[in-house]
Amino acid sequence: MSNLNLHNKRVMIREDLNVPMKNGKITNDERIVRALPTIQKAIEQKARVMILSHLGRPEEGKFEKEFSLAPVARLLSKKLNQKVPLINDWLKGVAVEPGQAILCENVRFNKGENENNTELAKRMAELCDIFVMDAFATAHRAQASTAGVAAYAKLACAGPLLISEVEALSRALENPQKPLVAVVGGSKVSTKIHLLENLLDKVDQLIVGGGIANTFLKAQGYSIGKSLCENEWLDAAQQFWEKAAEKNVSLPLPVDVIVADELSEDAKATVKNIDAVTSNESIFDVGPNTSATYAKLMAQAGTIVWNGPIGVFEIEAFSQGTRALAQAVAKSTAYSIVGGGDTLAALDKFNLTDQMSYVSTAGGAFLEFLEGKILPAIKILTQRAKEYEQK
């Protein structure tokens, strides 16, 4: 976008303004704040700006008030110091003045958005001279307002926010300062196996946490009591362990854990060595010795990639492991990139978000990029850029 003349052009910008809401009020405006520089740049260049976004998961093709972007339009108006009208039937066409921005109502209210309907994508493309894809968080979805319109617009380009996200991730994965340490938490090996396998070729150390660690511990012959575990993935975990050893990747498992008989606010939490977990106990966090080991690895790291908490941080008694890890990452001189909804919620809880080098709000796209997948919207933008260069 920064290479184009936007003056007097109809510029359609796809942002990710999918902010959390409670009772019609925005509870976290991080995604809106991140989108502002791109929108401001277009307004300053006297473009005729149309902003697109989705919000939540409404029934496609149907207006549902709770998923309306009205609260977002109000906040944008405040942040941009100009009235940003919310336009409902924008597909019929809308007149925008140079230097003005409008917000188009939730793209998911349009039938055909999710399955990337060609007619819908072409209609969106007709409404603009330039399409700017700035929403990395939706780049992994081939939908009408992302990859679809990018294919048919007269001119399609990447926005500054999308570029910054791709550059941050590429810096961590393609040309990292060594040693590269990855932390992969979460409850299931099955949802993170592609990520783990892709990271294995890149990292020096790989820390697994949460339910994923339980599956690895059980595969190594430890008793994990009633802990969350995927028994059908024990063989895969064992094979992965062997592969890591072959590639000289260190996979430090917990040496001590925090256990309880049940998961509740008033559960009696006890620190146990990993070989002392009884059959009626469940593991809900890592213990202090494990945290100390992880902190040492963070201090020595050149680059840190973190996705997923390593304990049930929402409950105070089981939050120490994730808290200690977040503090160690914050303290480290390493370049740190952190993503995933639960991880961001943990950082928020511990007031450490701004101590990370780069925080990705992208969720699924962050994960798929780390898995080594080519994201549909980025693929089409790359193709369009090549076409443009050849002209």
Swiss-Prot record:
<dbReference type="InterPro" id="IPR015911">
    <property type="entry name" value="Phosphoglycerate_kinase_CS"/>
</dbReference>
<dbReference type="GO" id="GO:0006094">
    <property type="term" value="P:gluconeogenesis"/>
</dbReference>
<dbReference type="GO" id="GO:0043531">
    <property type="term" value="F:ADP binding"/>
</dbReference>
<dbReference type="GO" id="GO:0006096">
    <property type="term" value="P:glycolytic process"/>
</dbReference>
<feature type="binding site">
    <location>
        <position position="192"/>
    </location>
    <ligand>
        <name>ATP</name>
    </ligand>
</feature>
<feature type="binding site">
    <location>
        <begin position="340"/>
        <end position="343"/>
    </location>
    <ligand>
        <name>ATP</name>
    </ligand>
</feature>
<dbReference type="GO" id="GO:0005829">
    <property type="term" value="C:cytosol"/>
</dbReference>
<keyword id="KW-0808">Transferase</keyword>
<comment type="pathway">
    <text>Carbohydrate degradation; glycolysis; pyruvate from D-glyceraldehyde 3-phosphate: step 2/5.</text>
</comment>
<feature type="binding site">
    <location>
        <begin position="54"/>
        <end position="57"/>
    </location>
    <ligand>
        <name>substrate</name>
    </ligand>
</feature>
<dbReference type="GO" id="GO:0005524">
    <property type="term" value="F:ATP binding"/>
</dbReference>
<keyword id="KW-0067">ATP-binding</keyword>
<dbReference type="InterPro" id="IPR015824">
    <property type="entry name" value="Phosphoglycerate_kinase_N"/>
</dbReference>
<keyword id="KW-0547">Nucleotide-binding</keyword>
<dbReference type="Pfam" id="PF00162">
    <property type="entry name" value="PGK"/>
</dbReference>
<feature type="binding site">
    <location>
        <position position="108"/>
    </location>
    <ligand>
        <name>substrate</name>
    </ligand>
</feature>
<comment type="similarity">
    <text>Belongs to the phosphoglycerate kinase family.</text>
</comment>
<feature type="binding site">
    <location>
        <position position="141"/>
    </location>
    <ligand>
        <name>substrate</name>
    </ligand>
</feature>
<keyword id="KW-0324">Glycolysis</keyword>
<dbReference type="InterPro" id="IPR036043">
    <property type="entry name" value="Phosphoglycerate_kinase_sf"/>
</dbReference>
<dbReference type="GO" id="GO:0004618">
    <property type="term" value="F:phosphoglycerate kinase activity"/>
</dbReference>
<feature type="binding site">
    <location>
        <position position="31"/>
    </location>
    <ligand>
        <name>substrate</name>
    </ligand>
</feature>
<dbReference type="InterPro" id="IPR001576">
    <property type="entry name" value="Phosphoglycerate_kinase"/>
</dbReference>
<feature type="binding site">
    <location>
        <position position="314"/>
    </location>
    <ligand>
        <name>ATP</name>
    </ligand>
</feature>
<keyword id="KW-0963">Cytoplasm</keyword>
<keyword id="KW-0418">Kinase</keyword>
<protein>
    <recommendedName>
        <fullName>Phosphoglycerate kinase</fullName>
        <ecNumber>2.7.2.3</ecNumber>
    </recommendedName>
</protein>
<comment type="subunit">
    <text>Monomer.</text>
</comment>
<feature type="binding site">
    <location>
        <begin position="16"/>
        <end position="18"/>
    </location>
    <ligand>
        <name>substrate</name>
    </ligand>
</feature>
